Amino acid sequence: MRIREGHLINDSAEGPIGLRTRLMGYIGLTKPRVIELLLVTTIPAMLLADRGTVDPLLIINTLVGGLLAAAGANTLNCVADADIDKKMKRTERRALARATVPRSHALIFGLTLSVASFFWLWSTTNMLSAHLAGATIAFYVLVYTLLLKRRTSQNVVWGGAAGCMPVMIGWSAVTGTIQWPALVMFLIIFFWTPPHTWALAMRYKEDYEAAGVPMLPVVATEQQVTKQILVYTWLTVLATLALALTTGWLYASVAILAGTWFLVMAHQLYAGVKRGEAVKPLRLFLQSNNYLAVVFVALAVDSALALPTLLHV
């Protein structure tokens, strides 16, 4: 039994559901890999907010609250998407699709985590961070999952806003306010989400089509999709450069180099489709994770070292 990309993988013969299997099912509902990526952006945001002098206990408390919020939102997303997860090969091994965890129990689990995240952040950080976390969960579940996901090909554009909120929560936990660097970090992730998700959707187009989810690759041509990927990749890189106004030389250098690499990959995908070649969009999906991680790790190091900045925030 193991977890992979939020899926419950059962390597043993079918049989009664044991305690360990059930426990792994609950863990899978929270989508640990997704949480990992979200939390990678929180620490750099907090370090930038106070140029590396943040209380370690505040960082830990914010991460715990963010983990609870993301786990709760992901679990509730799985509850709402249980019907379509059964129809997609990529998600057919998730706990609810396989009935490893009762749907009602998953709902209670998700709600409990969500409520716990609010009160944890309220008691250990501040009210603004708690409200931002609560609003993020509500937006992700009610607006993205229930309203947008099955109705529009632009679902991930607007729904992706939920994935941008960890930087806002991290910043507000330190400062008690929202300032323009936090908004720029929000935009970085907002613009990064469509090319990241659409590249995956290109690879699993048949899955989404079978489930009736109108992802852009399902309703548009590959050339149209890769053109949109290219546009959002450029916007992502430009946003990372805008953030360089409030960072040191280390972040700025990494943002330029990593951004160039990300743009080259997006242009190669677009050019390959335009020439009618067989392309591998999953490569862009995987490398986009690395890109975001590299940029935010550079931001964390730059901020921790308190390198001289172009502008003082």
From Swiss-Prot:
Broad class of enzyme this protein falls into: transferase
Membrane spanning residue stretches: 34-54, 56-76, 105-125, 128-148, 152-172, 173-193, 237-257, 291-311
Main location: membrane
Metabolic or biological pathway: Porphyrin-containing compound metabolism; heme O biosynthesis; heme O from protoheme: step 1/1
Alphabetized Pfam families for the sequence: UbiA
Keywords on record: Cell membrane, Heme biosynthesis, Membrane, Transferase, Transmembrane, Transmembrane helix
Catalytic activity, as annotated: heme b + (2E,6E)-farnesyl diphosphate + H2O = Fe(II)-heme o + diphosphate
CDD domains noted in UniProt: PT_UbiA_Cox10 (cd13957)
Membrane topology: Multi-pass membrane protein
MF term (GO), any: protoheme IX farnesyltransferase activity
Domain of life: Bacteria
A cellular component term, taken from the record's GO annotations: plasma membrane
GO biological process, one term: heme O biosynthetic process
Subcellular location: Cell membrane
Its EC number(s): 2.5.1.141
Function: Converts heme B (protoheme IX) to heme O by substitution of the vinyl group on carbon 2 of heme B porphyrin ring with a hydroxyethyl farnesyl side group.
Further facts: Carbon 2 of the heme B porphyrin ring is defined according to the Fischer nomenclature.
Family: Belongs to the UbiA prenyltransferase family. Protoheme IX farnesyltransferase subfamily.
Name by which UniProt lists this protein: Protoheme IX farnesyltransferase
Record organism: Mycolicibacterium gilvum (strain PYR-GCK) (Mycobacterium gilvum (strain PYR-GCK))
Lineage of origin: Bacteria, Bacillati, Actinomycetota, Actinomycetes, Mycobacteriales
